[in-house]
């Protein structure tokens, strides 16, 4: 998972060529439990780092998920809209949520590495 960056609000980000893929972490999906609904943003939406991107709803709770960086939504994962359990089964691949074209790519540097994120989780427990 060295290709991933993380937030303290349990989102992950993977850099691709000209966009980034965003989802919620395995830790977050474990805490939430079985997903039953995912609300995604619209393609073309402009978001700022930390702004709400959408909602994931599980049998336990509904939780907002946030933009790890500023950018424009270029794609949403329609598959998780139809089958929210993908977020539980494969949060880092098939269960991705949104793709963004970064407006300030330097914001990625401020995100957590896998090791930093694991330390953050350990402190929460």
Curated annotation (Swiss-Prot):
> What is the protein named?
Glycine cleavage system H protein
> Which Gene Ontology biological process is one annotated for this entry?
glycine decarboxylation via glycine cleavage system
Record's keyword terms, sorted: Lipoyl
**Keyword Transcription regulation among UniProt keywords:** no
- What family name appears in the similarity comment? Belongs to the GcvH family.
The family database entries (Pfam families) matched by this protein are listed as: GCV_H
How the cofactor binds, per note? Binds 1 lipoyl cofactor covalently.
Q: What is the role of this chain? A: The glycine cleavage system catalyzes the degradation of glycine. The H protein shuttles the methylamine group of glycine from the P protein to the T protein.
Spell out the coiled coil positions from the record. none
Q: Which cofactor does it need?
A: (R)-lipoate
Question: What does the entry list under GO cellular component?
Answer: cytosol; glycine cleavage complex
The UniProt gene name for this protein comes to gcvH
Lipoyl-binding domain mapped to chain residues:
19-101
PTM-bearing positions, type N6-lipoyllysine: 60
InterPro entries, alphabetically? 2-oxoA_DH_lipoyl-BS, Biotin_lipoyl, GCV_H, GCV_H/Fam206, GCV_H_sub, Single_hybrid_motif
Keyword Oxidoreductase appears in the UniProt entry: no
- Known partners and oligomeric status: The glycine cleavage system is composed of four proteins: P, T, L and H.
NCBIfam families, alphabetized: gcvH (TIGR00527), PRK01202.1 (NF002270)
Superkingdom classification of source: Bacteria
Q: Which PROSITE patterns match?
A: BIOTINYL_LIPOYL, LIPOYL
